[in-house]
Amino acid sequence: MSIPQELYYTKDHEWLRKEGDEVVIGITRFAADQLGDVVFVELPQVEDTLQMGGTFGVVESVKAASDLFSPITGQVIATNPDLAEAPELVNEDPYGKGWMLRLKPEDPAQMDALLTAQAYTAWLETCSSFAVRFGQNLTL
Protein backbone atom coordinates (compact mmCIF):
# COMPACT_ATOMS: atom_id res chain seq x y z
CA MET A 1 0.00 0.00 0.00
CA SER A 2 1.43 3.34 -1.04
CA ILE A 3 1.44 6.04 1.64
CA PRO A 4 1.84 9.56 0.17
CA GLN A 5 4.87 11.11 1.87
CA GLU A 6 3.72 14.74 1.70
CA LEU A 7 0.59 14.24 3.81
CA TYR A 8 -0.08 14.23 7.55
CA TYR A 9 -2.00 11.36 9.16
CA THR A 10 -4.01 10.41 12.24
CA LYS A 11 -4.36 7.13 14.11
CA ASP A 12 -8.01 7.27 13.02
CA HIS A 13 -6.77 6.81 9.43
CA GLU A 14 -7.43 10.29 8.13
CA TRP A 15 -5.02 12.30 6.01
CA LEU A 16 -4.43 16.04 5.84
CA ARG A 17 -2.78 18.11 3.14
CA LYS A 18 -1.68 21.73 3.64
CA GLU A 19 -2.66 24.02 0.78
CA GLY A 20 -1.58 27.53 1.65
CA ASP A 21 -3.45 28.54 4.81
CA GLU A 22 -6.05 25.79 4.29
CA VAL A 23 -6.09 22.07 5.01
CA VAL A 24 -7.76 19.36 2.92
CA ILE A 25 -8.94 16.24 4.81
CA GLY A 26 -9.91 12.73 3.70
CA ILE A 27 -9.58 9.11 4.78
CA THR A 28 -6.63 6.89 3.95
CA ARG A 29 -6.48 3.99 1.52
CA PHE A 30 -6.29 1.68 4.55
CA ALA A 31 -9.54 3.11 5.95
CA ALA A 32 -11.27 2.92 2.57
CA ASP A 33 -10.17 -0.70 2.11
CA GLN A 34 -11.34 -1.65 5.61
CA LEU A 35 -14.73 -0.07 5.04
CA GLY A 36 -15.34 -1.75 1.70
CA ASP A 37 -17.56 -0.13 -0.91
CA VAL A 38 -18.57 3.32 0.34
CA VAL A 39 -22.24 4.06 -0.41
CA PHE A 40 -22.85 7.33 1.46
CA VAL A 41 -20.82 10.16 3.00
CA GLU A 42 -22.34 12.67 5.44
CA LEU A 43 -20.29 15.84 5.81
CA PRO A 44 -20.70 19.08 7.79
CA GLN A 45 -22.01 22.33 6.36
CA VAL A 46 -19.74 25.01 4.98
CA GLU A 47 -18.96 27.54 7.74
CA ASP A 48 -19.42 24.94 10.51
CA THR A 49 -16.66 25.04 13.11
CA LEU A 50 -15.09 21.68 13.90
CA GLN A 51 -13.36 20.91 17.18
CA MET A 52 -10.26 18.74 17.30
CA GLY A 53 -11.36 15.21 18.23
CA GLY A 54 -15.04 15.90 17.58
CA THR A 55 -17.05 14.06 14.97
CA PHE A 56 -17.66 15.84 11.68
CA GLY A 57 -19.48 13.24 9.63
CA VAL A 58 -20.13 9.62 8.80
CA VAL A 59 -18.97 7.25 6.08
CA GLU A 60 -21.37 4.40 5.32
CA SER A 61 -20.26 1.34 3.42
CA VAL A 62 -21.67 -2.06 2.61
CA LYS A 63 -19.88 -3.33 5.76
CA ALA A 64 -20.25 -0.59 8.36
CA ALA A 65 -20.93 3.03 9.24
CA SER A 66 -18.00 4.90 10.75
CA ASP A 67 -17.77 8.31 12.35
CA LEU A 68 -15.24 10.79 11.03
CA PHE A 69 -13.19 12.71 13.60
CA SER A 70 -11.72 16.15 13.11
CA PRO A 71 -7.94 16.02 13.53
CA ILE A 72 -7.73 19.78 14.07
CA THR A 73 -9.97 22.70 15.03
CA GLY A 74 -11.13 24.94 12.24
CA GLN A 75 -13.90 26.30 10.06
CA VAL A 76 -15.21 24.29 7.11
CA ILE A 77 -14.74 26.32 3.95
CA ALA A 78 -15.69 23.60 1.43
CA THR A 79 -16.92 20.03 1.21
CA ASN A 80 -16.48 17.72 -1.76
CA PRO A 81 -19.68 18.13 -3.80
CA ASP A 82 -18.90 15.04 -5.90
CA LEU A 83 -19.30 12.66 -2.95
CA ALA A 84 -23.08 13.18 -2.82
CA GLU A 85 -23.52 11.56 -6.24
CA ALA A 86 -20.36 9.44 -6.32
CA PRO A 87 -19.36 8.27 -2.81
CA GLU A 88 -17.31 5.51 -4.43
CA LEU A 89 -14.65 8.16 -5.11
CA VAL A 90 -13.54 7.57 -1.51
CA ASN A 91 -12.55 4.02 -2.53
CA GLU A 92 -11.32 4.81 -6.02
CA ASP A 93 -9.13 7.82 -5.22
CA PRO A 94 -8.96 8.49 -1.46
CA TYR A 95 -6.02 10.91 -1.73
CA GLY A 96 -7.38 12.81 -4.73
CA LYS A 97 -10.97 12.97 -5.97
CA GLY A 98 -12.20 11.30 -2.75
CA TRP A 99 -11.21 14.24 -0.50
CA MET A 100 -13.90 15.18 2.02
CA LEU A 101 -13.50 18.72 3.27
CA ARG A 102 -11.37 21.82 3.31
CA LEU A 103 -10.74 23.64 6.61
CA LYS A 104 -9.33 26.97 7.66
CA PRO A 105 -7.36 25.90 10.78
CA GLU A 106 -7.86 27.89 13.96
CA ASP A 107 -4.37 26.95 15.16
CA PRO A 108 -2.04 25.63 12.44
CA ALA A 109 0.34 24.40 15.17
CA GLN A 110 -2.12 21.54 15.81
CA MET A 111 -0.71 19.97 12.64
CA ASP A 112 2.54 19.38 14.54
CA ALA A 113 0.86 16.66 16.62
CA LEU A 114 -0.11 14.61 13.55
CA LEU A 115 1.75 11.61 12.17
CA THR A 116 4.26 11.78 9.34
CA ALA A 117 3.99 9.20 6.56
CA GLN A 118 6.77 7.20 8.25
CA ALA A 119 5.01 7.25 11.64
CA TYR A 120 1.68 6.35 10.01
CA THR A 121 3.31 3.39 8.24
CA ALA A 122 4.61 2.18 11.62
CA TRP A 123 1.11 2.63 13.08
CA LEU A 124 -0.36 0.49 10.27
CA GLU A 125 2.18 -2.23 11.03
CA THR A 126 1.10 -2.14 14.68
CA CYS A 127 -2.56 -2.39 13.67
CA SER A 128 -1.83 -5.30 11.34
CA SER A 129 0.24 -7.12 13.97
CA PHE A 130 -2.59 -6.74 16.47
CA ALA A 131 -5.11 -8.13 13.98
CA VAL A 132 -2.93 -11.14 13.17
CA ARG A 133 -2.10 -11.78 16.82
CA PHE A 134 -5.71 -11.75 17.94
CA GLY A 135 -7.17 -13.17 14.73
CA GLN A 136 -9.48 -10.25 14.09
CA ASN A 137 -10.48 -8.22 11.10
CA LEU A 138 -9.79 -4.57 11.59
CA THR A 139 -12.79 -2.35 11.25
CA LEU A 140 -13.01 1.36 11.74
Swiss-Prot record:
CDD domains: GCS_H. PROSITE patterns: BIOTINYL_LIPOYL. One of its GO terms (cellular component) is cytosol. InterPro entries: Biotin_lipoyl, GCV_H, GCV_H/Fam206, GCV_H_sub, Single_hybrid_motif. It comes from the Bacteria. One of its GO terms (biological process) is glycine decarboxylation via glycine cleavage system. Gene3D superfamilies: 2.40.50.100. The modification N6-lipoyllysine is found at residue 63. Its cofactor is (R)-lipoate. It holds the Pfam family GCV_H. Residues 22-104 form the Lipoyl-binding domain. Keywords: Lipoyl. Transmembrane segments: none annotated. Binds 1 lipoyl cofactor covalently. NCBIfam families: gcvH (TIGR00527), PRK01202.1 (NF002270). PANTHER family: GLYCINE CLEAVAGE SYSTEM H PROTEIN, GLYCINE CLEAVAGE SYSTEM H PROTEIN-RELATED. The glycine cleavage system catalyzes the degradation of glycine. The H protein shuttles the methylamine group of glycine from the P protein to the T protein. The glycine cleavage system is composed of four proteins: P, T, L and H. Belongs to the GcvH family. This is Glycine cleavage system H protein. It comes from Magnetococcus marinus (strain ATCC BAA-1437 / JCM 17883 / MC-1). The gene is gcvH.
